[in-house]
Amino acid sequence: MTTRSITLGIVGDSAAGKTTLTRGLVRVLGEDNVTHVCVDDYHRYDRKQRAERNITPLHPDCNHMDVMAQHLAHLRAGEPILKPVYRHEDGTFGPLVRVDPKQFAVVDGLLGYYTEELRRLYDVRLFLAPPEELRRQWKVQRDCSRRGYTTDQVLAELDRREPDSEAFIRPQQRYADIVVSFLPTPGSEQDRLDAELILRPTLRHPDFRSVLDGEAAEGGIRISEIDGETHLRIPGCLDAERARALEEMIWDGLHFASHLRSDRLGEFTIGTDLHRSESLALIQLLILYHLFTATASVALGGEGARTPEPVTG
C-alpha cells in the first residue's frame, strides 16, 4: 500500500456485540478492502495459564499491549504484520499468520483504547455498552452454543471477571467518539432492540435533526444535547419509511461511496437464523460515513476526520 489504512476501533466487554457489528461492516465494505484484527489474539497467556495465575483476559497484564500497539501502527502505515492467533475454541494459541494492510482496518476487542499510544492510532473509536443483564444473556448464549461451556460455568466466569470489567473495560468508554447501547424493548424480539447513541464532538456527525419529528415523537427517533454531546435514541420498532429517510440523509453525505449501498446493512444471525435490525443498519451506516469522511480527508492530504480533543489534566 502507498497510503495509510483508515482504522476503526470497536471496544466493549465480552459478548457486547463486537463481532456482530464487525462482521456486518466487513460484509458491506468487502473482505478485499478490510483487514480485521481481534486484539484477543494478543493475550499473553492461554486459558490454562490464566487459570494457574488466577488472572482474567480483561487485565492489561494478561495481554501484550506493546505488541498490539506496534502492530496496529504498522497496519495503519500500510505495512504487513506477523500476528499471533488465539483460538477461543480451546483457549490455546495457533501459529503466527501474516496480515497485509488494506484500505480499512477494523480492530475489535477488550482493551483497544487502554493506552494513549493505542488511542492515537484510530480514525474512529466506537464503544459498545449494552446493559449488563442483556450482555450476560448474550454471553451465556454464545459461550454455551459455540465454546462448550455450561450456563453455570459462564455465569461463574462473569462474576469472576466483574472486578476487571469495572476497572479496565468500562472506563474506556470515555475515549470513544460513539458509544452504542442496545436496549431491549418490552415485548419485542431480539431483532427489535432499541439503540441509544452518544455522539461526541471528536467527530463531525451528520445533522440528524433534518429528518426528526421532534424530541418526544412517539415511535420515532429522539435527540437531545447533554453536556456538549448528542444523545440519539433509535427505536427498534422504527418503521421502514422513517428508517429509509434517515439512511438517505446519511447517504447524501456519502455520494463518493454510493457503490456501497446494500440491503445487507443491519443483518445478523441468531443461531442459524438471519435477522435484520433497522437500528443496527443505521449504526453501521453512521460508521461508514465516518470511515469515508476520514478516507476523503487523507486523500486530500489531511490527517483524518477527527477534531482536536481537549487537553485534560
Regions found by a protein language model. Give the residues of each.
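Conserved lysine of the Walker
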Residues: K18
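ATP-dependent NMP and nucleoside kinases share a basic, alpha-helical "lid"
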Residues: L96-C144
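Phosphate-binding P-loop
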Residues: M1-S5
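Conserved nucleotide-sensing/catalytic segment adjacent to the nucleotide-binding pocket
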Residues: D32-C38, R44-F93, F104
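The conserved Walker
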Residues: S14
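Short hydrophobic/aromatic beta-strand immediately N-terminal to the Walker A/P-loop
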Residues: T7-G9
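Hydrophobic positions on the alpha1 helix immediately C-terminal to the Walker A/P-loop
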Residues: L21, L25
